[in-house]
Amino acid sequence: MNSEIHIVIVWEKGLDKVEAILFDLKNDFQILEVNKVVWSEYHFSNNLSRFYGQKLPSGSFKEKHCGKGPFYTIIIRQNNPIYKFRKTSKGKEKVNSILFDKKQLYRKWTGGGHKVHTSNSLD
């Protein structure tokens, strides 16, 4: 059996939907771990920059949009993932289609934007 481990992040401004997201994830994934993460306000923009691999200044749109407070990381396992092409922020890419589609759904639930992050593939 082929399985993959992925991460789902629900940023501070999406936390009002974290319980619904956890409930829904159980339909397609095994939840391995749920963690509440707190980054110091002083280092938040540096941590966010390292995470996304691009320099994000303090007070960036991303920071304001997602929040600088506590957030949740959810580690999941999916057995027998299915890869399909989807339009991503980097263009058309082959991604874990179930997880990618869930991310799009959760982003709608949280009011649009990027208050939910997931890995899209093993790359």
Residue ranges and their predicted role:
Residues 1-123:
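Non-catalytic terminal and connector segments of soluble metabolic enzymes
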